[in-house]
Amino acid sequence: MRTLSAAFVCLALLARQADAAEARHLTLTLPRALGPGETAFANVELGLLARGLEIEVTTAAGRELGVISPHGIRAGQEAGTYALPIPPDAIVKGRVALRLSVNQFGHTRAPTAKEVKSVRVKITPAVR
């Protein structure tokens, strides 16, 4: 029984290490609390990306916020900044935990600092 328990612990640790190798985990703090009708966005600034590369952004719990799949970018140009809405229920105590991963031809890995240059939270005003 102890051997079986030890095996499960080892598998759990390996799975956690594999997830860390396949994604970048970030916890971002909102600049202030959301007001009525306001929306928080994750602004993802991308650098140089290889052709066919996609950036998947989810909450730490696995809820998909979006997939960034730039097309038509010339070789040597940065991919730009993309805004993904953050659901209000994903914000806990003024923070949001995100997971970013790169998908390319069926393989998943963590993005490099050159691929994802920054991720910031921006609050947009309510639409009137």
Predicted regions and their residues:
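Sec-dependent N-terminal signal peptides of Gram-negative exported proteins
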Residues: T3-D19
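Beta-strand-rich recognition domains
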Residues: D19-R128
